[in-house]
């Protein structure tokens, strides 16, 4: 998201929960004012993203013409400090102030006798269900535009869904 990228730069690369309140909470009045103020910089970033996307399409088409499959990696969880979480807080187990309600991990198993704490917000599945999993569908759709084969990393996060208190 170009807007979150520009805000991150403006606020010295701080995570979104350390931004001023009006931006942390995505106050539309302040965001619209910001977008108007920074319209040229935002347009430049959008053009750069478009150009990179076009270059990727050339690479993908070249690979396809030589019967080469491109493999991508889609993480099950997204970073707490991602544009996805900042833009869609209601879909994640996160308080408006950025603190985690629940965080991800896996219980003890043969890889780790103590389990693993991944530190990423878990999902509010009921909210995803209400949107017919729109966020997920768009996420997969975009990845399949970029690659031919997609590895879902870590499927264990779905098959053995586990969450712990966010303050753990």
Identify the meaning behind each predicted range.
Residues 7-9, 55-62, 129-150:
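An active-site-proximal structural segment forming one wall of the substrate-binding cleft
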Residues 2-4:
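Short, small-residue-biased leader/transition segments that mark boundaries at the very start
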Residues 45, 49-78:
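Conserved, well-ordered alpha-helix/loop/beta-strand core segments that scaffold catalytic motifs
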Residues 6-46, 86-128, 162-168:
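Aromatic- and acidic-residue-enriched carbohydrate-binding clefts of CAZyme catalytic domains
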Residues 13-14, 146-149, 156, 161:
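Intrinsically disordered or highly flexible coil/loop and linker segments, enriched in small
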Residues 70-72, 150-153:
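Hydrophobic faces of well-ordered beta-strands that scaffold small-molecule active sites
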Residues 74-82, 117, 156-161:
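Active-site-proximal loop/turn and secondary-structure-junction residues that shape catalytic pockets
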Residues 24, 64-66, 71, 145, ...:
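Acidic, mature catalytic/reactive cores of soluble proteins
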């Amino acid at each position: 998201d170009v807007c979150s990228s520009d805000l991150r730069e403006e606020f010295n690369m701080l995570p979104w929960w350390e931004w001023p309140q009006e931006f942390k909470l995505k106050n539309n009045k302040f965001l619209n004012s910001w977008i108007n103020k920074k319209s040229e910089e935002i347009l430049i970033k959008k053009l750069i993203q478009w150009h990179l996307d076009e270059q990727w399409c050339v690479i993908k088409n070249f690979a396809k013409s030589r019967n080469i499959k491109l493999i991508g990696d889609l993480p099950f969880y997204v970073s707490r400090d991602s544009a996805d979480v900042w833009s869609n807080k209601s879909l994640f187990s996160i308080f408006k102030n950025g603190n985690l309600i629940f965080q991800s991990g896996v219980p003890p198993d043969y890889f780790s006798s103590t389990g693993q704490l991944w530190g990423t917000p878990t999902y509010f599945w009921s909210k995803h269900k209400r949107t017919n999993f729109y966020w997920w569908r768009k996420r997969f759709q975009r990845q399949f535009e970029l690659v031919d084969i997609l590895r879902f990393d870590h499927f264990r996060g779905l098959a053995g869904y586990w969450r712990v208190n966010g303050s753990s």
